[in-house]
Amino acid sequence: MKPSVPTGPRRAPWRSRDVWAISLSAFFADLGYQAVLAGFPLFLVLTLHRPVWEYGLASSLSYGGGALFSYAGGRIGDRLGHRSLALAGNAVIPLLSLCALVANPVWAIGLLTGGWWARNLRSPSRRVMLVEAVPADEDRSAAFGFLHALDVGGGALAGVYVLAALAVHLAFRWIFLATVVPLVLSTVSLSRAHVGGRRVADAPDASSGSPGEAPPPGARALLAAAALYGFTYYSVGFPVLTVAQGSGRLLAGIGAFLVLQATSALTGYLLGGRLGSGPAGQFARLGLLGYLGAAVGAGVVAFGYGEHLGLAVLLIGVAVIGFALGIIETLEPAAMSVLRSGSRTGRGMGALSAARSVGTFVGNLAMGLLYGVSVSLAYGYAAGVAGLAGIIVLVAVPSLRRWHRDR
């Protein structure tokens, strides 16, 4: 007798209770802090009347210090347990919700930075928890795409919230303070995941290598590209300011935030499981669709702003940037989970987050300074460096393919 064949749609096997808990935590976290990130440049520049370079400095401090917290978070999580560290860091993020309660820009930037550093501390551990929840390498890109979709989907809803709040002239202090609620729900949701506990180090395997063995050929290329992309990974506040200033409408800036977040979320959700399971294929798509796509998007914004082509062209450029971001946020951690597996996953994720943060420290500072000279020059710089990141990743594909074949 032949076994019966199940019919009808089936739930993806990797979409377990732990994956849902981690992904919903990401949704609520972005729903909270992305509302602050969307409104903070408007609060600092338009309400407190501070120059744009101060916003660039604030972003640089957040990401620069965040690099240290990311790197330390990966290592500490490997020693003490990723679940405990992720919960502790997540619980401190609401500091940034308090930044509009003060009129002093130094205190406002300090509160924003403190909450962001807590986010950086927990981010590598949250990624490791997802890796442990999805043991099959071939399912990782789909899982990280799902995480990114809910993550950025929360950010898109945050944009809707800020847009509606500004439309009814709600003060920034109340807009930001209300974000404490979803941030607390984020920590509650993360606590329902039961992976990421403290464990003894795994025995070295072919993918993680022995302590003295050189890392896989793609690992250094991935970290270098992540850092270079970080040099162009300006805070989302810059597109918000660009569209608001280019169109002369404050609400259009928040609309740009919504376009970027929604495009990025849909990309992760729809394409996450279709981007390949092997590291060589993932690297090729990361370089072409991710980094080079980001270069194209920044170029469109630079050209559209410089030639005064109107709101539609600016939003097209922002949408391309969002698409590229969805590819990058899905494939970077998925590739690293293969290159650095087992007990080295935390260090690999920490190094990846740190590389991005170091680059972003420079990127936001450069964008803030160049933005004051020429908006088109700032985005032209971003396009050039993102293109270089894409080339570095694509050059590593042949050697990575050989490494994966010989494993």
Range-by-range predicted roles:
Residues 173-191, 379-396:
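Symmetry-related core transmembrane helices of the 12-TM Major Facilitator Superfamily/SLC fold
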Residues 111-151:
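Cytoplasmic helix-loop-helix junction between adjacent transmembrane helices
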Residues 344-373:
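A late C-terminal transmembrane helix in Major Facilitator Superfamily
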Residues 84-98, 180, 282-300:
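Structural signature of the two symmetry-related core transmembrane helices
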Residues 12-63, 220-256:
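Helix-loop boundary and gating motifs at the non-cytosolic
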Residues 282-332:
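C-terminal transmembrane helical hairpin of 12-TM major facilitator-type secondary transporters
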Residues 67-104:
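Conserved MFS/SLC helix-loop-helix module at the cytosolic interface between two early adjacent transmembrane helices
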Residues 69-81, 266-281, 371:
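Helix-to-loop junctions at the C-terminal end of transmembrane segments
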